[in-house]
């Protein structure tokens, strides 16, 4: 018969052709801490942009995937930083400057996401009749059309992403993984 390992090998072959791998290992320590056997609501979920939705820092009793989602995301362009601070421009890598600017960008993006979150939270149920009027989000069925969204959006995620890791490494240090 087919084993889990056989399915993993097959999925690797398919991903190699499609170039869009999304693997989620429920038994990894990072995911297993939230998993309750037999409860599909506790299986980790990944959004299309690969945002991981499972842990809930607002309400650990609602560390589930259904009824939650990624509210906003912003991606940091790593190749730009790699070019700016890497050997591609002046044959010298400045890792200290790279990580300093990366830290500054992450703080900037965090602040931007929190500002966007506040804007979203000040909207009302009637602004999103399909998403929130259908009781799709956690606790949204408890709200009236004129209620603000913080009570449901607090369960969502905000994501700082990045693009171009291999290209960044190539321009920063001359090689990638």
Language-model segments: what does each one mean?
Residues 1-154, 175-177:
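Conserved catalytic cores of very large enzyme subunits
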């Amino acid at each position: 018969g087919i084993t889990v390992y056989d399915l993993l090998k097959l999925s690797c072959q398919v991903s190699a052709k499609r170039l869009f791998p999304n693997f989620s290992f429920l038994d990894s320590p990072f995911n297993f801490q939230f998993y309750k056997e037999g409860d599909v609501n506790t299986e980790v979920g990944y959004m299309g942009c690969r945002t991981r939705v499972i842990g809930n820092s607002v309400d650990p009793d609602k560390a589930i995937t259904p009824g939650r989602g990624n509210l906003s995301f912003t991606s940091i362009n790593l190749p730009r930083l790699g070019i700016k601070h890497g050997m591609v421009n002046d044959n010298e890598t400045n890792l200290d400057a790279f990580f300093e600017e990366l830290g500054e960008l992450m703080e900037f993006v965090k602040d931007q996401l929190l500002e966007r979150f506040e804007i979203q939270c000040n909207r009302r149920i009637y602004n999103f009749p399909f998403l929130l009027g259908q009781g799709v989000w956690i606790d949204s069925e408890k709200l009236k059309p004129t209620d603000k969204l913080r009570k449901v959006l607090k369960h969502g995620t905000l994501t700082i992403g990045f693009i171009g890791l291999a290209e960044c490494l190539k321009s920063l240090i001359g090689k990638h993984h």
